Structure formats: C-alpha cells, structure tokens
C-alpha cells in the first residue's frame, strides 16, 4: 500500500514539475515575443513620424502627393514584411532590428547612409515647395514600380538567408548561403538596396534629391570590401564561395 502511494506521489510531483517547466517556457517565449512586438511597433511608428517630419515640414504643407506616395510604398510593404517575420521568423526580425555596428568602417557607412536619406528627403521636400525641378509622371511611376520590386526582392533575400542582419558579423553556426539570388551575386541584398535608394528621390519627384543619393553605391562598395574581409576570416567556406560566384552586386560589371 505504501509502495503504491509512494509511486502515485512521485507521479504527481513529476507532473507538477513538468507543468511548471512548461508554464515557465511558455511564459518566457511570451515575454520574449511581447518585447519584440513592442520594439517593432515603436521603431515602425517612430520611422513614420521621422520620415513624415523630414518630408512635410520642409514642404510647408501636407499637400505633397509624392511624399504620401513614397510613405505608402515604404511603410505598407514594411508593415506586411514585419508581420510575416514576426509570425514566421521572429529571430530574424530581432536581428534586423539590431543596428549596433561594431566595426568602425561599418559605423561610418551607416552614418553616411543616414545622412544621405536625411538630406535627400529634405531637399526633395524643398524642391517641391519652391519648384526647383519637375520629374515627369511616367518617371515617378517607373521609379515606384522599381521601389516595389526592390522591396519584394529584399524580402526574398531575407527568406533565403536566415543569417541576414543589419550589422556586419559572423554569427554562431553561420553557413555560407549559395542558393537563389546568392548563386548570381554574392551580395544580393546590397544590390537590391542600391536600386531601392536610387528610386526614392524620383518617387519624391526631385532631380536635385537624386544627387544626394548618387554616393550611396560608393558607400555600399566600401561596406562590401570590409564585410568580405570579415567573412573570409571568420566564415568557413566563404573563400571557396567567392571563387564560385564571381560577381559582388552586378553580373558582368562588379
């Protein structure tokens, strides 16, 4: 009788231990996802406010159609992509939200890229306000299509490469990705962002703002040079991958 009671007691104790571990794990996952969701929402709405301020304050009006068009083309796909990543790949989303570069070269590239956007947005808005230049409607439409396609390709690159982050680093257990767009060029994400960045001032309807974005490909070249040095030193198989895939961002050119 005592043996049966002891066995039953052990089963109950083990059940409670397992239940507590299950609740703890679920609670930890819930807290982690809640924190990620809050971080995502804060950065998303902060981005809307910042870009809106950079466009509409210098424009001196909210009646800036190209400004609204750009914000829609930028933030609607961003919202959709964010929802998909949050549901399907929260770890990748967390990495994409992290923007603390460790390399000095990369820190400089990030700062100059931010400066390009800041100046480009303000000059585009001032161009609209004072009528410095006029971009034909068909150019705005083509640029809008290019921006959307670039965003779609950007999402595809993220789907192919689970190690993709905003910072240049070699992650734990990282492997070389050589499928999809990575079979064509070694840095498809950067290739896509060049098209995306250069389409922005045209969507905003400003030739003068385009001049601000022209240096962006040069910054990408600097970033790639530094990144490949880091990957060759820390990522097994990357040297062989470089020999296999010759082009960095544009086939038959570079």
What are these regions (language model features)?
Residues 41-45, 67-72, 110-111, 140-144, ...:
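Hydrophobic alpha-helical transmembrane segments
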Residues 4-30:
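Short, Lys/Arg-enriched N-terminal segments with co-localized hydrophobic residues
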Residues 53-68:
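Short, hydrophobic transmembrane alpha-helix segments
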Residues 50, 110-124:
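Hydrophobic alpha-helical transmembrane segments of multi-pass integral membrane proteins
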Residues 82-108, 126-254:
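Cytosolic-biased juxtamembrane loops and peripheral soluble domains of multi-pass membrane proteins
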Residues 40-55:
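The first (N-terminal) embedded transmembrane alpha-helix
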Residues 52-57, 121-122, 197-201:
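Alpha-helical transmembrane segments of multipass membrane proteins
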Residues 55-59, 125-130:
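Juxtamembrane "helix-exit" motif on the non-cytosolic side of transmembrane helices
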């Amino acid at each position: 009788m005592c043996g049966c009671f002891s066995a039953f007691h052990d089963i109950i104790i083990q059940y409670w231990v397992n239940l507590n571990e299950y609740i703890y794990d679920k609670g930890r996952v819930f807290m982690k996802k809640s924190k990620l969701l809050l971080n995502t929402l804060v950065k998303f709405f902060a981005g809307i406010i910042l870009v809106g301020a950079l466009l509409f304050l210098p424009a001196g009006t909210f009646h800036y159609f190209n400004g609204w068009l750009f914000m829609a083309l930028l933030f609607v796909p961003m919202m959709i992509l964010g929802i998909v990543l949050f549901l399907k790949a929260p770890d990748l989303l967390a990495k994409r939200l992290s923007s603390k570069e460790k390399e000095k070269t990369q820190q400089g590239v990030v700062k100059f890229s931010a400066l390009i956007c800041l100046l480009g947005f303000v000059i585009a808005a001032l161009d609209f306000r004072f009528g410095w230049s006029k971009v034909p409607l068909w150019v705005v439409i083509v640029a809008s299509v290019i921006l959307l396609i670039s965003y779609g390709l950007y999402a595809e690159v993220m789907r192919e490469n689970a190690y993709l982050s905003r910072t240049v680093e070699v992650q734990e257990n990282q492997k070389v990705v050589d499928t999809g767009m990575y079979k064509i060029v070694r840095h498809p994400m950067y290739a896509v962002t060049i098209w995306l960045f250069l389409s922005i001032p045209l969507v905003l309807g400003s030739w003068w703002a385009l001049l601000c974005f022209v240096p962006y490909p040069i910054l990408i070249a600097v970033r790639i040079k530094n990144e490949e040095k880091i990957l060759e030193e820390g990522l097994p198989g990357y040297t062989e991958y470089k020999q296999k895939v010759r082009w960095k961002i544009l086939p038959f050119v570079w």
